[in-house]
């Protein structure tokens, strides 16, 4: 399993994705098809936290007047399943690894992942 979750309107997602060979990856545009409960569980198994998968930059937070500080893990899960914009993106997911968001350290690890993948092929 190799999946990338992104938004087609997100230039950051597109820029990050363009840096890698995604030929054998399933590419999912979240607005067209949101993450499923099963996929979110797979992500959670690796991160151990729904909050780590939650985008605190989502415009839905302000629109729904959500106080993020009061949310519990199940709240983060439910919100991500309810609206695509609550999932931090892009998400690169394999059976054993996950890379979430556009933070510098995450992107460095993602680059290392792809470099090592090419070394073993």
Question: Could you describe each region identified by the protein language model?
Answer:
Residues 33-121:
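Thiol/selenol-based redox catalytic cores and closely related redox-interacting motifs
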Residues 1-30:
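Local sequence-structure signature of Cys/Sec-based thiol-disulfide redox active-site neighborhoods
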């Amino acid at each position: 399993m190799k999946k990338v979750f992104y938004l087609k309107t997100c230039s950051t997602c597109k820029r990050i994705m363009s840096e890698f060979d995604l030929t054998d990856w399933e590419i999912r545009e979240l607005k067209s098809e949101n993450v499923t409960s099963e996929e979110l569980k797979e992500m959670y198994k690796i991160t151990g936290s729904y909050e780590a998968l939650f985008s605190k930059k989502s415009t839905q937070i302000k629109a729904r007047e959500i106080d993020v500080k009061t949310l519990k893990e199940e709240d983060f899960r439910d919100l991500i399943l309810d609206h695509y914009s609550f999932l931090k993106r892009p998400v690169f997911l394999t059976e054993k690894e996950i890379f979430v968001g556009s933070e510098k350290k995450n992107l460095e690890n993602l680059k290392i992942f792809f470099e090592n993948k090419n070394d073993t092929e």
